[in-house]
Amino acid sequence: MAHGLVTFSDVAIDFSQEEWACLDSRQRDLYWDVMLENYSNLVSLDLESPYGTKSLPTEKGIYEINLSKWNSNGKSKSLGLDWMCEGEFEGPQGPRESCFNQMIINYEKTPTCRENTSVRPHQRLHTRENSYECKECGKAFSRGYQLTQHQKIHTGEKPYECKECKKAFRWGNQLTQHQKIHTGEKPYECKDCGKAFRWGSSLVIHKRIHTGEKPYECKDCEKAFRRGDELTQHQRFHTGEKDYECKDCGKTFSRVYKLIQHKRIHSGEKPYECKDCGKAFICGSSLVQHKRIHTGEKPYECQECGKAFTRVNYLTQHQKIHTGEKPHECKECGKAFRWGSSLVKHERIHTGEKPYKCTECGKAFNCGYHLTQHERIHTGETPYKCKECGKAFIYGSSLVKHERIHTGEKPYECKECGKAFSHGHQLTQHQKIHTGEKSFECKECGKACNHVNHLREHQRVHTAEKPFEQKEGAEASIQHSFLPQHKENP
């Protein structure tokens, strides 16, 4: 690393006075520990010091910062705090400048950091010393506070509770971040698109969308990511590592939040409830997506055709229509699919697996979506409502088809004659006129028809059924009045 490229201000952590007040003594000790380590690292690498200590000669080459107490008269740029101290830097020529509180930084300007006791935390970067081991799982850490934080995963301890909603957290900084949800505070705004964020780290990650920067690269396949946690998760595909196991069913997960969500399947807990319709969900993201049914919001738009979607994964799936990409192939029959989930569902045709069972009637389905739709028959839920006439439907696809009555849209056009239809199955039936296909055959005489309704009419010849038979009186005239309609609309 070149001399002077990194200063202490580049690695300092920002805290406002209010945020600092939220930290307990252990967290403040942790803060000073980290700041000391960062400063020692810079010194040991002979990088620029914000305190100018390198220009102060001493007999031994050792410099000491003597410290005093804090006040709130200004801001320390080097620490990023809204406080500064009244103490002074004591060099061989007397007081020099303002300094840290309750910290003494000693370092010796020598060629190697290993000869200096003040840079032991830095040495662990080279030696990878992990002297603090968890007795529960064997995981080791280089710092004691890291082990303390980790152990809360096993004990379930969550000492930091939100006064607004009573939600509890393992660490204080998680609570601080969570509280911004209640206040609605989003102080970090993107200059490129105006989008605002609760946390500065979210803004930093977001900016990479505009710059295209992907600083985290996988050494195995060279795939790059915007975020470090995305890389960590990706690397588990190569290693097969799954750290978090469900004690109820043994299923393992690569991320702890996925395990937490999964456990709610066993417990039945659905903490995220829609205020509009009362429907509850296992995870918050599902609630956010559900709310778009009520608001009509479709934030994800296809740049090719302008079609918009409520979920980003729907857009990703849709875009494969334009590219024609079908990377997922069935080993049994060779059929290819755009999406892996479609392949999984398709494979159940071969295996006969139907893992999704209705608790009301026992009917089983090969995919969860079909079960969800089926359950609405029992509950009577019709979440998809037409804005024109107010008619409601069980399925979103039914609403889409219904809306074509109002719009007059007929998106399915016959390439042979140009006739258009509002539904795909109508076009399929119509095309049989051109192809001569007659797929519906009478078992009595072998006559084939191109439409199931035509077959039903024909079968009455064999059964001698006469649904529109002439009768005397008013009843006969009423029944006979339907006969012309039947002939016009076979």
From Swiss-Prot:
Subcellular location per the Swiss-Prot or TrEMBL entry: Nucleus
Stretches assigned to the KRAB domain: 6-78
Keywords: DNA-binding, Isopeptide bond, Metal-binding, Nucleus, Repeat, Transcription, Transcription regulation, Ubl conjugation, Zinc, Zinc-finger
SMART domains given in the database record: KRAB, ZnF_C2H2
Cross-link named Glycyl lysine isopeptide (Lys-Gly) (interchain with G-Cter in SUMO2), sites: 109, 401
Domain of life according to the entry: Eukaryota
One GO cellular component, as annotated: nucleus
Gene Ontology molecular functions: DNA-binding transcription factor activity, RNA polymerase II-specific; RNA polymerase II transcription regulatory region sequence-specific DNA binding; zinc ion binding
Name of the featured protein: Zinc finger protein 331
Species per Swiss-Prot/TrEMBL record: Canis lupus familiaris
